[in-house]
């Protein structure tokens, strides 16, 4: 019996008046599209979602979404035996789209490669708890930066180099403390001002008019929550980190400087309005609650992700696209940088 037949058999056994009209198996996810009979409510599908998942031989909690334009309810389940989606298997340099800072993030749930140009958005926020794939997403952005010859890396690792320590020889600067982060951001603000002066002299308003005029700069900050906590207690420089970050976020894009912030705790105390307003691209891995999901995505849903790199990208060019973050280790990134 095929997947559609198995699903319909399960629905019948549960006395659910719905028909599976489509079933697709992909590398990491399978989904089943149900068309409800008259009188059948979505709530009933949600009530028996666990039993449906078990019936189609999935051990993971399913995710139920309504797709009104198609008149269906979609049940997504994870493939327990799926292979690791390796970045090196996915990345092909000759497939890289034209752009200022194109990044290959992974694969959508329909099997398509997910490319995003970080330069098309002011900046990027990443959130996710332990085991969600947040750190992997950071390493993927670093992997893309390495493969762009004209991208300079500035990394912030408040955990004393635990996350980014292996990049010591390839990054332009790694800050591992609050004080080092403040120094780095001040230097980058000065570089931003210098670039604006050069652009003015050239009669340009943005690096987009000639992407080759400066090397791009990627600022990648892990666990911004730790820095915000320090920032609220430091005297006499209280708030210095936030002020420098907002200054860069508001002005740096036109100068070819792009910021990626990551946090395990996407609370309103960490991602304040002045910060969120300038970080239009959001990558949500699994978070602990619907409240956290609303902070990062302005909607619930990320709390139901499956972990291990199951993520949602929301930006001006990709509206809530679910995808699997590709995997690459820091060691692989370091080997690539030496090639």
Feature locations, PLM:
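P-loop NTPase catalytic phosphate-binding loop
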Residues: 6-22, 27-35, 40-44, 51-55, ...
């Amino acid at each position: 019996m095929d997947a559609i037949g198995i699903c319909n058999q399960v629905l019948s056994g549960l006395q659910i008046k719905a028909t599976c009209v489509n079933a697709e198996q992909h590398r990491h996810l399978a989904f089943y599209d149900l068309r409800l009979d008259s009188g059948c409510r979505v709530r009933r599908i949600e009530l028996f979602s666990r039993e449906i998942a078990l019936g189609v031989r999935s051990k993971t909690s399913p995710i139920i979404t309504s797709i009104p334009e198609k008149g269906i309810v979609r049940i997504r389940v994870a493939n327990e035996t799926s292979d690791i989606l390796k970045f090196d298997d996915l990345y092909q340099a000759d497939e890289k789209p034209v752009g200022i800072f194109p990044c290959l993030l992974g694969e959508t749930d329909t099997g398509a490669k997910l490319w995003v140009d970080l330069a098309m958005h002011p900046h990027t926020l990443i959130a996710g708890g332990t085991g969600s794939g947040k750190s992997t997403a950071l390493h993927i952005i670093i992997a893309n930066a390495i493969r762009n010859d004209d991208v300079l890396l500035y990394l912030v690792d408040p955990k004393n180099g635990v996350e980014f320590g292996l990049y010591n020889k390839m990054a332009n600067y790694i800050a591992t403390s609050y004080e080092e982060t403040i120094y780095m951001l001040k230097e980058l603000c000065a570089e931003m001002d210098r670039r604006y002066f050069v652009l003015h002299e050239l009669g340009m308003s943005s690096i987009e008019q000639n992407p080759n005029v400066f090397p791009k700069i990627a600022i990648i900050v892990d666990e911004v929550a730790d820095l915000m906590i320090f920032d609220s207690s430091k005297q006499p420089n209280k708030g210095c980190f936030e002020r420098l970050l907002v200054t860069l976020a508001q002005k740096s894009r036109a100068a070819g400087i792009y910021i990626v912030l990551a946090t395990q705790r996407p609370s309103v105390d960490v991602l304040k309005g002045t910060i969120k307003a300038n970080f239009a691209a959001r990558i949500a891995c699994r978070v602990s609650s619907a409240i956290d999901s609303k902070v990062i995505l302005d909607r619930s849903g990320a709390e139901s992700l499956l972990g291990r790199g199951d993520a949602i990208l929301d930006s001006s060019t990709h509206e809530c696209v679910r995808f699997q973050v590709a995997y690459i280790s820091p060691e692989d990134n370091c080997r690539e940088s030496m090639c």
